[in-house]
A protein has these predicted regions:
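Intrinsically disordered, low-complexity segments enriched in Gly and acidic/Ser/Thr residues
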Residues: 204, 211-250, 255
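A short, amphipathic beta-strand motif
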Residues: 44-53, 114, 120-130, 207-214
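Short, ordered, surface-exposed loop/turn motifs in non-cytosolic proteins
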Residues: 1, 51-69, 128-154, 214-231
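Structured interaction patches on ligand/partner-binding surfaces of diverse proteins
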Residues: 17-41, 94-117, 180-204, 258-284
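Short, recurring structural edge motifs at helix starts
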Residues: 33, 48-51, 74-77, 109, ...
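Post-signal-peptide, soluble extracytosolic/periplasmic N-terminal scaffold domains
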Residues: 1, 5-17, 27-34, 44-58, ...
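Short beta-strand segments within Ig-like beta-sandwich modules, predominantly Fibronectin type-III
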Residues: 1, 26-28, 68-74, 102-104, ...
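Short Pro-Gly-centered beta-turn/loop motif in secreted/extracellular proteins
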Residues: 2-12, 16-19, 40, 77-95, ...
Length: 284
């Protein structure tokens, strides 16, 4: 209830029940008490979000409740007052989404289970099968849609840097794209609703570390030349040291020096092996 002393006249009161609001016109007359009444035409809705029908309540889930101009949202299992009629529920857990339409009757007290088919995936990587695990946070995991678009690309669903981190995912089939240095690997995987999935990516890669005292720039290029006689650049940087993650194979290392030094550029060969660190020194 609400009480106030008002001058005689016509007014509009605004009443709220949660996010449900109603406007009530009323008139105050001299010497009398106005008693406007409001009918919210609403119900009490408790949303119970789950990843699968047999899983526990998901406390991290967000549910948006909409009907026309009405909007409200709750987290985890929670209650909101909603207007009667058809109400749209949109639940989300990370990138996973689910929608349902409920028919609400005024005065009801409803508890509704909203299933948002989703799970989590934990990605790890090794440099080679049965080889050393990747520990650097420079590695990037991207979960992509299994189907390609018309232009041949895949939609990014989620992504993280570093290994062993949890990614929220909708249930379904996907492709994990993994990048470290100049290495990129794609591997299919499946997420089951209400479950935790683990994927271990074989990068088939090694590390090439180059030291070149006095160098101005170090470049790693392909050993073969194209029809124009040029070698494709793979990686490079200014300075006397350079390190890169590469697929196994033979590479050329080009070292250039400041013009003032009067030194000629150098080129040497280097071989990278899976799960190994190759250290190459370019003498002065």
């Amino acid at each position: 209830t609400f009480e106030a002393k008002l001058p005689a006249g016509r007014y509009v009161g605004v009443a709220a029940l949660g996010n449900v609001t109603r406007e009530i016109p009323f008139e105050v007359k001299d010497g009398s008490v106005a008693r406007p009444k409001v009918n919210f035409d609403a119900a009490e809705l408790t949303v119970v979000p789950k990843r699968s029908p047999d899983s526990d309540v998901e406390t991290q889930a967000k549910t948006e409740i909409t009907k026309g101009d009405f909007k409200d949202s709750v987290y985890g299992q929670n209650t909101a007052f909603v207007p009667a009629g058809e109400v749209l529920l949109t639940g989300s857990i990370g990138p996973a989404r689910a929608q349902e339409t409920l028919a609400i009757k005024a005065g009801e007290k409803i508890s509704h289970e909203l299933v948002i088919p989703s799970g989590v995936v934990v990605a790890k990587a090794v440099y080679a099968q049965d080889g050393k695990a990747v520990e650097t946070d420079d590695i990037r995991f991207e979960a992509l849609s299994a189907k390609e678009t018309l232009d041949g690309t895949r939609q990014t669903i989620n992504g993280v840097y570093g290994t062993g981190k949890i990614m929220e995912m909708p249930a379904g089939d996907f492709v994990m794209r993994t990048r470290l240095g100049k290495v990129m690997v794609e591997q299919p995987f499946t997420v089951t609703a209400g479950k935790r999935s683990e994927i271990n990516i074989d990068l088939n890669a090694g590390v090439l570390a180059i030291t070149a005292p006095g160098a101005e720039r170090i470049d790693i290029v392909e050993t073969t030349k194209d029809l124009q006689g040029t070698q494709k650049e793979i990686s490079g940087r200014y300075g006397t040291r350079h390190q890169e993650t590469l697929h196994p194979g033979d590479y050329s290392v080009k070292v250039s020096y400041d013009e003032k030094s009067g030194r000629d550029p150098k080129e040497i060969k280097a071989t990278v092996k899976a799960a190994e660190r190759t250290e190459t020194n370019v003498p002065e």
